[in-house]
Swiss-Prot record:
Name the record gives this protein: Regulatory protein VirG
Lineage: Bacteria, Pseudomonadati, Pseudomonadota, Alphaproteobacteria, Hyphomicrobiales
GO cellular component: cytosol; protein-DNA complex
Post-translational modification: Phosphorylated by wide host range (WHR) VirA protein.
Subcellular location: Cytoplasm
Annotated NCBIfam families: PRK13856.1
Keyword set, alphabetical order: Activator, Crown gall tumor, Cytoplasm, DNA-binding, Phosphoprotein, Plasmid, Transcription, Transcription regulation, Two-component regulatory system
Domain Response regulatory: 3-117
Stated role: VirG is required for the positive regulation of at least two vir loci encoded by the Ri plasmid of A.rhizogenes.
Family annotation (Gene3D superfamilies): 3.40.50.2300, 6.10.250.690, Winged helix-like DNA-binding domain superfamily/Winged helix DNA-binding domain
Length: 241
């Protein structure tokens, strides 16, 4: 049974979500604040997180940010107001995977939950024993850790991690925006011109320091982006030929 964790300070909304998803064979935990939310995350397996941005005294985006750096759990943002493009950019930067505005239909909400579950990184990837070595970095797939040559760890959101893996699997191959959208798991109906550009900019900033003068992730004008570096890969400690 898949576990959905919901944070919303609206009691009626929590009851509605719990009742509806339970009918459709989900385990649902609904909480009102980040303290309860984090307690559940630390003690139980969660398959999808639903985060309300309007939490009164708390910042829903900060909850999204914290979760994205700790987990690959898909996050659906719900809001009482229609999200503008700027809000979506911020949410994508922080690691959100889907958006829905109140009031919403229960059938649509259920459909989005199911899509998020389908798009979650597969069990095969969590058992992936590959490590990629490039420039001054190591990316461990199973542990989802990006480590610098000096030993420092850089936190990646789920979208950034998926995007980097796509580049490392095909170094120096030009990848179109469409390919990168699929790789990063940005939902097609939420795509707009800046979706991939935002993720690329953030990934450049984390890898290179100066995203305005990229040396690793380069632009192929009119075609997409490519990763311009030698990449070595090992499988469980054994370097590939």
């Amino acid at each position: 049974m898949k576990h959905v964790l919901v944070i919303d300070d609206d009691v009626a909304m929590r009851h509605l979500i719990v009742e509806y998803l339970t009918i459709h064979a989900f385990k649902v935990t609904a909480v009102a604040d980040s303290k309860q939310f984090n307690r559940v995350l630390s003690s139980e397996t969660v398959d999808v997180a639903v985060v309300d941005l309007n939490l009164g005294r708390e910042d829903g985006l900060e909850i999204v940010r914290t979760l994205a750096t700790k987990s690959d759990v898909p996050m659906i943002i719900i809001s009482g107001d229609r999200l503008e493009e700027a809000d979506k950019v911020v949410a994508l930067e922080l690691g959100a995977t889907d958006f829905i505005a109140k009031p919403f239909g229960t059938r649509e909400f259920l459909a989005r939950i199911r899509v998020a579950l389908r798009e979650r990184p597969s069990v095969a990837r969590t058992k992936d024993r590959r490590s990629f070595y490039f420039a001054d970095w190591t990316l461990n797939i199973r542990q989802r850790r990006l480590i610098s040559e000096e030993g420092g760890e850089i936190k990646l959101t789920a979208g950034e991690f998926n995007l980097l893996v796509a580049f490392l699997e095909k170094p120096r191959d030009v990848l179109s925006r469409e390919q990168l959208l699929i790789a990063s798991r940005v939902r097609e109906e939420e795509v707009y011109d800046r979706s991939i550009d935002v993720l690329i900019f953030r990934l450049r900033r984390k890898l290179e320091g100066d995203p305005t003068s990229p040396q690793l992730i380069k632009t192929a004008r009119g075609a997409g982006y490519f990763f311009d570096a030698d990449v070595n890969v090992s499988y469980g400690g054994m370097m590939a030929a």
